[in-house]
Design a protein with these regions (language model features):
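A generic local secondary-structure boundary/capping motif
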Residues: 18-19, 109, 128-129
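Conserved class I S-adenosyl-L-methionine
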Residues: 115-124
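Conserved SAM-binding loop of SAM-dependent methyltransferases across substrates and taxa
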Residues: 125-138
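Short beta-strand "acidic-cap" motif of Rossmann-like dinucleotide-binding folds
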Residues: 141
Length: 165
């Protein structure tokens, strides 16, 4: 199993009772996670001093409760910069566990000894797109959501990769 342990700006701090406590840069968020089935004490002080909490509705969906959280902020993974903003269905705009995949294919791209082209489908906000572009690949980023494509362009600009994907 690969572990995404190279993050400096993201960590899972604790988890219990269907929720996880995460640090995204300097902000602490509580989000539901159906995989968290254990019921351990929520002793970490972050549970009480969170910046945002996504509350799932019994009817489906849910909503964010913001305690002290900007509309948008940035986190970094190695040389990449991501713009985060909580939006519907508990998302923040990034799946940090995917960093292991980014590292794997970035190494393959750098060591290929030839030009590499990548087609990133369902590309969301561009984590994989940016990692491949930063490693030297020519990338085509495709997502059905115009908003996600715009967000990926923002992330590319923040990472100094506007001319790449």
């Amino acid at each position: 199993m690969w572990i995404a342990d190279q993050w400096k700006d993201y960590e899972v701090i604790d988890c219990s009772k269907g929720e996880k406590l995460e640090r995204w840069g300097e902000y602490i968020l509580v989000r539901p996670d159906p995989q968290v089935i254990w019921d351990t004490p929520k002793n970490d002080r972050g549970w009480k001093h969170k910046n945002g909490h996504y509350h799932r509705s019994k009817k489906g969906g849910g909503e964010w409760e913001f305690i002290s959280l900007p509309e948008q902020w940035q986190i970094h993974y190695k040389d990449l910069t991501f713009n985060l903003k909580p939006f519907s269905f508990k998302h923040t705009g990034l799946f940090p566990e995917q960093a292991t995949n980014w590292d794997w294919f970035s190494e393959k791209i750098r060591n290929a000894g030839r030009p590499i082209k990548v087609l990133n489908l369902f590309a969301y906000t561009g984590g994989a797109t940016l990692a491949a572009a930063a490693a030297g690949a020519s990338v085509t980023h495709v997502d059905a959501s115009k908003g996600m494509v715009s967000w990926a362009k923002e992330n590319a600009a923040s990472s100094g990769l506007s001319d790449k994907p």
